[in-house]
């Protein structure tokens, strides 16, 4: 009985979503939107070294959503610290690339509903004896990706707490990991999944503890683009109910 009720309820939800899609303005049809992505933020968004094409969890997810919702999407790699200005300047139409929803960003853009949650972690060499307490209390060099929410949060925390470490800024999390390995910095701070991606590919690094609140990822849009947000929110709802969502998780998420 409960299984039948759940199945009936799901059918009603999908029917309502289908009716909602039909009610959306015609702007979606034959419209191409440009999605700005970080070129080196695996597994969410990156440029594939073999093909030279944008790839990743978010890239494939938005491509699926575009097809489902009746529009097309072009994924445009660009520098992360300039990606919100590019959105506001209409060089791109959205940012679906592992972008954290923050109060500061929400002042200038709107976000879709959250579609992923990820913890923030410290990363060191695999044979390092550093602990999270050591990282926060010693005058080490700590790598972060410029323009990220985790960098901004830890910088603010450092100013309040007086942590003695020195920030080293990078264009991407993988570049920070590279400098951990070659000894230019003692540790890095980043979202957990780029660290997991590096470890799964054989990098001799390890996670040494979480720090701060988890990040919630959403798609960033211009504040006035409310209809596009409706398309994307509906698209993610449909995607998460589709078997392809599990396929994406299995393909890109190493844990």
Predicted regions and their residues:
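Periplasmic-binding protein-like
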Residues: 39, 117-126, 192, 196-237, ...
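Ligand-binding cleft/hinge of the Venus flytrap
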Residues: 47-48, 62-69, 150-169, 199-203, ...
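Beta->alpha turn/N-cap motifs
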Residues: 37-41, 76-81, 90-102, 118, ...
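Flexible hinge/capping segments at coil-to-helix
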Residues: 124-142
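A ligand-binding cleft/hinge motif common to bilobed small-molecule-binding domains
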Residues: 82-85, 98-107, 153-156, 179-213
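Extracytoplasmic small-molecule ligand-binding "clamshell" domains
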Residues: 30-99, 107, 244
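Short helix-initiation/N-cap motifs at beta->coil->alpha
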Residues: 59, 75-85, 130, 167-179, ...
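Hydrophobic residues within well-ordered alpha-helices
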Residues: 65, 87-88, 135, 180-181, ...
